[in-house]
Amino acid sequence: MKPLVKLFLLFCLVGIVLSRPMPEDEEPVAEGGDDDASGESEGEEETTDDAGGDGGEEENEGEEHAGDKDAGGEDTGKEENTGHDDAGEEDAGEEDAGEEDAGEEDAGEEDAEKEEGEKEDAGDDAGSDDGEEDSTGGDEGEDNAEDSKGSEKNDPADTYRQVVALLDKDTKVDHIQSEYLRSALNNDLQSEVRVPVVEAIGRIGDYSKIQGCFKSMGKDVKKVISEEEKKFKSCMSKKKSEYQCSEDSFAAAKSKLSPITSKIKSCVSSKGR
């Protein structure tokens, strides 16, 4: 603005000078003044040129400032664009992170499904193994049952136990009051029935084969014992001693029990083969 003010003041001074009347006797002076005026005019022109130069410089400076502003705007735009780019990159990063999270979730679900599938397969395998074990156990149980059945059919000890129990049941003499007679008859049963019968069954393993051989043994033995009891009472009524009467019964019972044992031994020998 200062060059413009100077220029305006200069024009005002020139106008004032030119508006003043020039005296005739002072023409040379006027001429000199003209020269001065022309010099002043030239000075004014130079000043104008200087002002123009200054104005050009100012214009150039304004243009430079404007350029700087434009450059600043461009920089600002670049910064804004950079901000947008950064924001876009952040959005892209978030999208990538979201995709990664989604991928991880999908992978986790797949792993969980695989684990469940493996567990189910393991459960199926365990079930099949249990089933095989159960079936194996069932087979073993059947085999054991068959073995037990076979052992029962071929168990001489079982045959012995059943025969002895039957002899104890059918050859009891505990009901006899006389101690002498009871002891005498018990000795006869032991020597004539129990021992020979046990020897007869030997190693027979299937008791059912010889079970019929003992069907009448109890009845036959009881008949002999009953007869000897009657004879013993008859002997005692004759004023004989108890010992003597028991000895008589002992000899008679022995001869009556032998046929019973012979019949059993013959039956066992034929059926036990």
Curated annotation (Swiss-Prot):
Subcellular location: Secreted
Signal peptide range in chain numbering: 1-19
GO cellular component, one term: extracellular space
Region spans: Mediates binding of host collagen: 137-273
Biased composition (Acidic residues): 24-62, 87-145
Effect of inactivating the gene: RNAi-mediated knockdown results in significantly increased probing time and decreased feeding success when mosquitoes are fed on mice but not when using artificial feeding system with defibrinated human blood. Reduced collagen binding activity of salivary gland extracts and saliva. Reduced capacity of salivary gland extracts to inhibit collagen-induced platelet aggregation. No significant effects on ADP-induced platelet aggregation. No significant effects on the anticoagulant activity of salivary glands.
Listed Basic and acidic residues bias regions: 63-86, 146-158
Keyword field: Allergen, Disulfide bond, Hemostasis impairing toxin, IgE-binding protein, Platelet aggregation inhibiting toxin, Secreted, Signal, Toxin
Region (Disordered): 20-160
Positions of disulphide bridges: 213-267, 235-245
Record family assignment: Belongs to the aegyptin family.
Subunit architecture: Monomer; exhibits non-globular elongated shape in solution.
Protein's name in the database: Aegyptin
UniProt source species: Aedes aegypti
